[in-house]
């Protein structure tokens, strides 16, 4: 082995012996409340810091002062880099389905395989070419190591293609040079330049193909940036790209080893030290070993990268390649066109999960089941108010709501823009507040509860959640609401009127002493008072046991509500209104109205404060039903 440096293990050992492998200037002592954290028994002394492994500093950096302004060129590597990481690699049917998805999303560069290493990949590439499945505006990418027989086989796979990128690579990192290849820097560089020369020589065998080249110094993050530039410039010198016919220099974070800011420094260094920079597309190939792949990519684009390779929803070796869906939608939330069709993320997820045979996390950015879900009460309340405020602002501006600026607390993106719905935004559990319950009733049943009624009903919902120890779904909330406020008939439907989302529910017991059968309202003789006559069904306090009796009552007051309160006093019920709110539930000739009344039932020490709810096509009748609801609740035997 040619030796051009001390053993990588010697360097690491020295680093680990000093300051736990980190000789960077120490930060000020941490501030804390209470007792300090205790030293762990974790073997941190066996690890060397990245700065000890790859000494590098770049004070000339300019990327921190820049902002994202446009989407990079995207390249999907799902069909090769992603596929090789699967327990069960894709068969031809799954590969073709994935290919069709990528094309439909607007990818213009798609890595289709490693034809010299896999007969399956070779056959798939031949199928795409021979069946003319490659659109004219899509360029396929084929991968090969810097080995002669593999490169020759790669060109065989491309016969008949219109345009292709030949991507050749070799590992150049300190660790790989010493441990895997046992070659010095010059020998490693020669592997790359020999491969580049062979690719150029084989162009005569690829006549008719518009050929481009991509070179990757694999394990770039484990390589001295100065040496990476040296190798890349040597390859550029062989390929001789032009601005009209550029080549790609791809920087793989084959293993994520450091923080995104350091990676960005390295990328900017390479970008500013490459030869013929105007003839080079600088590309990234980030992995996610330390969970920072997306952040590292975005900072590296600021640092000069033009192109990004990754996989849909983050598939790939170990912890995966960077997620192109997350990146694209991050750009979208900044008002930048991602230049990919991400309007149906559920369908993208469905296809990716089918082809990869791997389920994604419930909390995967943008695509997971819970990403637009709020269980927290304060979050729910803020989302509800944010959606309402946005609608009001759009109406005031005379703007289309779908295109109006999106500013809603806790929701960085409009779920509708990516094929999601609002239905699952609010979820209720024992930790939720009244906002979630109120949102679901308003969204799914058109009931906009007053604040104090929300507080009252929330106690009922929370008691149910605490008892069941489960999520409280919309159906549970609606059943609880009916059972508490809307007298239920033998049919299991409410007696309050037609309600959005109401269904038969045999689990509910009929309740409600009084039921309004008919009401007539007229003016008194002098026109100053309202005369009301009502027919009610009195089912007794023990509904189902007592014999129902129809009763009539009449009353006079300065309006229908006052007259009705006067009428029911004939039943021995003294009631007064403390608060009254009503709203329409829909528009049109069959529109319904909802009324909410806060009543004092009884007098003096026996008085109860009770809310009632009524629904009817008549606003007046809905108010009277709400009063009956309050009375029924005050007399209900549980």
UniProtKB/Swiss-Prot annotation:
Residues 72-346 form the Pyruvate carboxyltransferase domain. It holds the Pfam family IPMS_D2. Mg(2+) binds at residues 81, 285, 287, 321. Its EC number is 2.3.3.13. The keyword Magnesium applies. GO terms for cellular component: cytoplasm. Its main location: cytoplasm. PROSITE patterns: AIPM_HOMOCIT_SYNTH_1, AIPM_HOMOCIT_SYNTH_2, PYR_CT. GO terms for molecular function: 2-isopropylmalate synthase activity; acetyl-CoA C-acetyltransferase activity; magnesium ion binding. Catalyzes the condensation of the acetyl group of acetyl-CoA with 3-methyl-2-oxobutanoate (2-ketoisovalerate) to form 3-carboxy-3-hydroxy-4-methylpentanoate (2-isopropylmalate). Homodimer. This is 2-isopropylmalate synthase. The gene is leuA.
């Amino acid at each position: 082995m040619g030796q051009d440096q001390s053993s990588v293990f010697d360097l690491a050992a020295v680093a680990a012996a000093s300051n736990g492998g980190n000789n960077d200037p120490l930060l000020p002592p941490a501030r804390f409340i209470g007792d300090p954290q205790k030293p762990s028994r974790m073997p941190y002394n066996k690890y060397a810091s990245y700065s000890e492994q790859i000494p590098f500093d770049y004070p000339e950096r300019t990327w921190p002062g820049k902002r994202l302004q446009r989407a990079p060129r995207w390249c999907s590597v799902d069909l090769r880099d992603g596929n090789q990481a699967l327990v069960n690699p894709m068969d031809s049917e799954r590969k073709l389905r994935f290919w069709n998805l990528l094309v439909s999303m607007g990818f213009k560069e798609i890595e289709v395989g490693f034809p010299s290493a896999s007969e399956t990949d070779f056959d798939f590439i031949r199928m795409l070419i021979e069946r003319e499945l490659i659109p004219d505006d899509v360029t396929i990418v084929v991968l090969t190591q810097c080995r002669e027989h593999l490169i020759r086989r790669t060109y065989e796979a491309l016969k008949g293609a219109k345009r292709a990128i030949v991507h050749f690579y070799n590992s150049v990192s300190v660790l790989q040079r010493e441990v895997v290849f046992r070659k010095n820097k010059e020998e490693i560089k020669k592997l790359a330049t020999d491969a580049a020369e062979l690719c150029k020589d084989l162009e005569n065998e690829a006549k008719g193909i518009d050929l481009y080249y991509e070179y990757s110094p694999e394990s770039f993050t484990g390589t001295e940036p100065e040496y990476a530039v040296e190798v890349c410039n040597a390859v550029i010198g062989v390929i001789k790209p032009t601005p009209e016919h550029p080549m790609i220099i791809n920087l793989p974070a084959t293993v994520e080893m450091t923080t995104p800011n350091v990676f960005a420094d390295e990328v900017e260094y390479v970008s500013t030290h490459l030869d013929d920079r105007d003839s080079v597309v600088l590309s990234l190939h980030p992995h996610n070993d330390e969970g920072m792949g997306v952040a590292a990519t975005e900072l590296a684009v600021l640092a000069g990268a033009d192109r990004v390779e990754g996989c849909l929803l983050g598939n790939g070796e170990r912890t995966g390649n960077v997620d192109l869906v997350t990146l694209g939608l991050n750009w979208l939330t900044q008002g930048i066109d991602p230049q990919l069709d991400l309007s149906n993320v559920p369908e993208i997820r469905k296809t990716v999960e089918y082809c990869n045979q791997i389920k994604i996390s419930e909390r995967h950015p943008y695509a997971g089941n819970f990403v637009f879900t709020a269980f927290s009460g304060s979050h729910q309340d803020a989302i509800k108010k944010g959606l309402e405020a946005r609608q009001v602002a759009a109406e005031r501006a005379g703007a289309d709501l779908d295109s109006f600026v999106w500013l809603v607390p806790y929701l960085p993106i409009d779920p509708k823009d990516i094929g999601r719905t609002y239905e699952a935004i609010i979820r209720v559990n024992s930790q939720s507040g009244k906002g979630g319950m109120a949102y679901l009733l308003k969204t799914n049943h058109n009931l906009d509860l007053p604040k104090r009624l929300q507080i009252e009903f929330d106690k009922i919902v929370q008691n149910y959640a605490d008892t069941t120890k489960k999520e409280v779904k919309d159906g549970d909330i609606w059943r609880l609401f009916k059972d508490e406020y809307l007298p239920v008939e033998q049919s299991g439907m409410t007696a309050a009127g037609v309600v959005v989302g109401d269904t038969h529910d045999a689990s509910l017991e009929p309740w409600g002493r009084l039921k309004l059968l008919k009401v007539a309202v007229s003016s008194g003789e002098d026109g100053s008072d309202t005369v009301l006559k009502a027919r009610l069904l009195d089912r007794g306090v023990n509904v189902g046991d007592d014999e129902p009796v129809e009763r009539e009552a009449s009353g006079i007051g300065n309006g229908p509500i006052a007259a009705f309160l006067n009428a029911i006093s004939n039943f021995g019920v003294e009631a007064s209104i403390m608060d009254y709110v009503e709203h329409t539930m829909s528009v049109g000739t069959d529109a319904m109205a909802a009324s909410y009344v806060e009543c004092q039932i009884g007098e003096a020490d026996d008085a109860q404060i009770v809310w009632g709810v009524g629904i009817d096509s008549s606003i007046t009748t809905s108010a009277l039903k709400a009063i009956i609801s309050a009375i029924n609740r005050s007399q209900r035997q549980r």
